Structure formats: C-alpha cells, structure tokens
C-alpha cells in the first residue's frame, strides 16, 4: 500500500468516527426483516444476505459447549435474563460456527445477530440506540477479539459489559470469540518488573484480565482428539457428497493432512474434506 492509499484509508476512518459523534449525526434504522444477520460497517448496519447455513447438529466434539451457550441463548430469546458470553480457546474448534448455528436455530424466533469488529466498538452507543425498544432480540457478535494496550474500543466494551453504556439495552447481549482467555496480550515483563515508580504494579496486570471477567459466561474450547478430528472430517466428507465413509485410505489421508498442518482442528478437517472430494471429481 503506497502513502496515498494509506492516507485515504486513515482519512476514511477518521470521517467515519467524526460522523458518529457529530451532534446532527443520524443512523437510519435498517429493515430488520430483510435479514437475520447484519454487519456494522462505516457507521451503518448492512444486511448479510448469505449467512452461513450451519446447524447445531453439524458441530461435533463440543457437546458441553453447545448446551451451555444454547441454554443461555434460549433464555434470552424467550425474554428471560441471560449473560454476555466469551468463547475462548483453541483455533478452529467451532467458536464462530457455534454463534452462526445459534442464529440459524433461533432466527425464526426473532433473534438477530450484528457482527462488529473491534474498531467499530466505539460506535456501540449508536447501535444500542438502534435496537433499544425493538421486539427482536439481538446478539452483538465480536469475532476473534483481542486488544493491545490502550487500543480503541477497549473502554467502550468494558463500559457496555458493566451495563454503564447509555442504559445498556436489555434486548442486546454480547457474544465474543477469542483465542485469548483474557483478550489482551500477557508479557513476561508484566510479572517480572515494575514500570517506573508504580506502587501497585499488580493492578496493571489485573486491569488486563478485568475485561474478560465482565463476561458472565465463559466457555472454553480445547484441541480435538484424533477420533474427534476423524469424526468431524467424516461429517464434512458427507456434506460434500462423499458416500464411501471413513475407509482406511481416507483415514490415512485425513491423518496425513492434519500432520502436515500441525493441527487436528475442525477447520483443518473441513479443509481436508474439500481437498479430498475435489480430487474425486
């Protein structure tokens, strides 16, 4: 990216932020019936027409995680109290897919998902204003969330989770996925040294974990066993039309694929199935 492109990108971001804080700035209500999923972009909600159609039954090896978040979401959709959720742990184990499956499960019961990246979190007051008082139930979905020190959006999200953000709406929950349990990078230097004349150095460390503590429900994901990986690969093979099951040849190929990738995640299993089925055409 040349300097002009960098300048234009930064200018566009600045204008977007200015529009959200100007006194006369307005955000138009979207057509909530046009889609079940929306994406917050450039200060507006855009419908996502082709949201991934995945069912809860398609997700293997995470039965406990499925039940915990399904129960929380069920309570919320039915008008009961429920918690904000942090899904954290190993990559490719179904964290994002689980949120998508929940939408497909409950979209017919007025559940809506709004996907937002961490740069857009500073616009949370605008989103709260859009959904407040509406009959639908909304999940604000932050995928692959993590923060660096003093990064934009951190304090806004923290205030929202505390319920301090413009009377945070009772028809809106936050579901976030992250590979980090505490959402912020931990450094050895935080534990081995103090900075300057700081009297209470451990308070800085506690601040780093304080954001994740504000999620009422923590759901952890772990690497899959070999048997779980093969079961997921078999499910994906069936999805792509393979009808010969997990025979010895396919099993060896699936294990070799995972070995070459250094992972037995569900994502890797899906990638293997695509490759294998594509080769059979």
For every predicted segment, state its role:
Residues 105-138, 144-150:
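AAA+/P-loop NTPase substrate/partner-engagement loops
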Residues 2-27, 222-281:
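C-terminal alpha-helical "lid" subdomain
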Residues 64-78:
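Pre-Walker A adenine-sensing motif
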Residues 114, 178, 188, 195-209, ...:
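Conserved AAA+ ATPase "SRH/arginine-finger" region at the nucleotide-binding site
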Residues 2, 44-68:
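Dynamic helix-loop-helix/coil hinge segments at AAA+ ATPase domain boundaries and subdomain interfaces
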Residues 149-197:
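Conserved catalytic/switch belt of AAA+ P-loop NTPases
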Residues 79-101:
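Walker A/P-loop nucleotide-binding motif
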Residues 48-50, 74-82:
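Phosphate-binding P-loop
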């Amino acid at each position: 990216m040349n300097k002009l492109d960098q300048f234009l990108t930064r200018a566009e971001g600045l204008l977007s932020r200015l529009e959200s804080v100007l006194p006369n700035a307005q955000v138009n209500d979207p057509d909530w019936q046009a889609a079940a999923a929306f994406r917050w972009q450039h200060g507006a909600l855009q419908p996502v027409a082709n949201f991934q159609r995945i069912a809860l039954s398609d997700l293997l090896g995470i039965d406990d995680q499925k039940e915990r978040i399904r129960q929380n979401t069920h309570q919320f959709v039915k008008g009961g109290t429920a918690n904000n959720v942090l899904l954290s742990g190993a990559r490719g184990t179904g964290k994002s897919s689980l949120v998508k499956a929940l939408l497909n499960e409950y979209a017919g019961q007025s559940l809506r998902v709004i996907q937002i990246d961490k740069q857009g979190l500073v616009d949370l007051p605008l989103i709260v204003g859009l959904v407040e008082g509406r009959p639908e139930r909304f999940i604000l979905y932050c995928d692959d969330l993590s923060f660096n020190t003093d990064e934009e959006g951190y304090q806004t999200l923290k205030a929202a989770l505390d319920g301090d953000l413009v009377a945070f709406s009772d028809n809106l929950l936050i579901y976030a996925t992250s590979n980090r349990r505490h959402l912020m990078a931990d450094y050895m230097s935080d534990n081995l040294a103090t900075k300057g004349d700081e009297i209470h150095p451990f308070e800085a460390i506690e601040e780093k974990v304080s954001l994740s503590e504000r999620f009422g429900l923590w759901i952890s994901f772990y690497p899959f066993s070999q048997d779980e990986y093969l079961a997921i690969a078999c499910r994906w093979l069936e999805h792509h039309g393979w009808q010969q099951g997990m025979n010895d040849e396919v099993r060896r190929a699936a294990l070799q694929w995972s070995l070459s990738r250094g992972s037995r995640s569900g994502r890797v299993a899906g990638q293997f199935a695509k490759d294998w089925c594509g080769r059979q055409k």
